[in-house]
C-alpha cells in the first residue's frame, strides 16, 4: 500500500490556510464601541460588552459523518458538534453558555434527525449549555447526505482571556488525554481503512472499526476548575493540524519530549497506511486532546484537578517538536 498523508487523502492544510487568508483579507469592516472585537483569529472571538466579553466560535463534525452513515449510527455525532465548539470556547478561558446548530441535508429523515438530537442533548448536558435553536436546510442539489455544524457563545472577564501571550521559557506543557480520534483526521483515517479493503464493521478489539472511530469527542469542562485554581499561561484544543495547534499561541519553541501513549486506533491507522510519524502528530491528537501551558510549580496542583501529566516544556525559539521530530519543518 502506498504511503498516505492528509494531503493525498484530500485535505491539504496549507492550501486551506491560504484560502482562509484570502477570505479574511477581503473582510475589513469592524464594529466600534459596545460590541467591538477585542480578540479575533483565535480559537474563539471575543466582543467587548463592558466588564466582560462575549465569546463566539463555530465548528462542525466534518467527515466523521461519513463513518456514521456507513454504520447507520447517528446518536453520538451531536456530542462531537457540541464538543468541537465548547472546547474552542474553553481554549481562550471562556465559560460556554449556549449554542445553535446548523444541519444541511439532502432529504429530511425523521429518524436521523431524532438520533442527531440525542447527541446534541447529551453534549449540552455535559457542557451545561442550552441549545437555543438552529437552522435545518434541505438542499438536494448541493448536499449528498448531510452536514452538521454549530455556533456557540460564552462569556469571559476581559482580564481573564487566555491567548498564550503569557507563555514564557521554562513553562511546562500538560496534556489531558483524548477519548480517541475525536473529530479531526477522519478523512485520512477513512481513506486508509477503505484502501485496505476493510469494512467499518470489522472487529477492532472489543468494538468494530466504525464504533472506535465514532467514539465521541471529549468535552473538557474541567478546564473551568483549572482556570479558577491554577496560573494558566496558554491553552490548546488539539484538533485539525494536530499538535501544530500550539503554533496558534505565542511564538515559542514547544517540545513534547514525553508524549502520552496514543490509543491503538492511531497506530492501527499509521501501520495500515504507512503514515509517517510526523504526519500522524500534525494530523491527529495522538491521545492528547487538550493542553495546558503553565509554570512548572503549578503542575502538581493541575494534576489534582484533571487527568493527564506533563508531556513537555517551552523554550525560546520557534517550532513544535515531538521528541526529535520538528512538525512544522
Curated annotation (Swiss-Prot):
* Family designation: Belongs to the AIR synthase family.
Q: What class of enzyme is it?
A: ligase
Alphabetized GO MF terms: ATP binding; phosphoribosylamine-glycine ligase activity; phosphoribosylformylglycinamidine cyclo-ligase activity
* Residue ranges crossing the lipid bilayer per the database entry: none
Protein localization = Cytoplasm
Q: Which domain of life is it from?
A: Archaea
Q: In the UniProt record, which is one GO cellular component term?
A: cytosol
Q: Which reaction does it catalyse?
A: 2-formamido-N(1)-(5-O-phospho-beta-D-ribosyl)acetamidine + ATP = 5-amino-1-(5-phospho-beta-D-ribosyl)imidazole + ADP + phosphate + H(+)
Q: What Enzyme Commission number(s) appear in the record?
A: 6.3.3.1
Give the source lineage, highest ranks first. Archaea, Methanobacteriati, Methanobacteriota, Archaeoglobi, Archaeoglobales
Q: What is this protein called?
A: Phosphoribosylformylglycinamidine cyclo-ligase
Is Zinc-finger among this UniProt entry's keywords? Answer: no
Q: Which pathway does it take part in? A: Purine metabolism; IMP biosynthesis via de novo pathway; 5-amino-1-(5-phospho-D-ribosyl)imidazole from N(2)-formyl-N(1)-(5-phospho-D-ribosyl)glycinamide: step 2/2
Keywords on record: ATP-binding, Cytoplasm, Ligase, Nucleotide-binding, Purine biosynthesis
Name one process (GO BP) from the record.
Answer: adenine biosynthetic process
Amino acid at each position: 500500500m502506498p504511503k498516505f498523508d492528509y494531503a493525498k487523502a484530500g485535505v491539504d492544510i496549507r492550501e486551506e490556510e491560504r484560502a482562509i487568508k484570502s477570505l479574511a483579507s477581503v473582510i475589513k469592516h469592524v464594529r466600534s464601541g459596545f460590541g467591538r472585537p477585542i480578540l479575533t483569529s483565535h480559537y474563539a472571538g471575543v466582543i467587548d460588552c463592558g466588564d466582560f466579553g462575549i465569546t463566539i466560535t463555530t465548528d462542525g463534525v466534518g467527515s466523521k459523518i461519513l463513518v456514521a452513515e456507513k454504520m447507520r449510527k447517528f446518536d453520538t455525532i451531536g456530542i462531537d458538534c457540541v464538543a468541537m465548539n465548547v472546547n474552542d470556547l474553553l481554549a481562550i478561558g471562556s465559560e460556554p453558555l449556549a449554542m445553535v446548530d446548523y444541519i444541511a441535508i439532502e432529504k429530511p429523515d425523521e429518524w436521523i434527525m431524532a438520533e442527531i438530537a440525542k447527541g446534541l442533548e447529551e453534549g449540552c448536558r455535559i457542557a451545561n449549555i442550552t441549545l437555543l435553536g438552529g437552522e435545518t436546510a434541505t438542499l438536494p442539489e448541493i448536499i449528498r447526505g448531510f452536514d452538521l455544524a454549530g455556533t456557540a457563545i460564552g462569556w469571559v472577564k476581559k482580564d481573564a482571556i487566555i491567548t498564550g501571550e503569557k507563555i514564557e521559557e521554562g513553562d511546562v506543557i500538560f496534556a489531558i488525554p483524548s477519548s480517541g480520534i475525536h473529530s479531526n483526521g477522519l478523512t485520512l483515517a477513512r481513506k486508509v481503512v477503505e484502501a485496505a479493503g476493510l469494512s467499518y464493521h470489522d472487529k477492532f478489539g472489543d468494538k468494530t472499526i466504525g464504533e472506535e472511530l465514532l467514539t465521541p469527542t471529549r468535552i473538557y469542562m474541567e478546564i473551568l476548575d483549572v482556570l479558577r485554581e491554577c496560573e494558566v499561561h496558554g491553552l490548546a484544543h488539539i484538533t485539525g493540524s494536530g499538535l501544530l495547534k500550539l503554533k496558534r499561541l505565542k511564538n515559542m519553541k514547544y517540545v513534547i519530549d514525553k508524549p502520552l501513549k496514543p490509543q491503538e486506533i492511531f497506530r492501527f491507522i499509521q501501520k495500515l497506511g504507512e503514515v509517517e510519524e510526523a504526519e500522524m502528530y500534525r494530523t491527529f491528537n495522538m491521545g492528547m486532546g487538550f493542553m495546558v501551558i503553565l509554570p512548572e510549580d503549578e503542575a502538581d496542583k493541575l494534576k489534582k484537578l484533571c487527568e493527564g501529566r506533563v508531556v513537555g516544556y517551552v523554550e525560546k525559539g520557534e517550532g513544535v517538536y515531538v521528541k526529535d521530530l520538528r512538525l512544522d519543518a
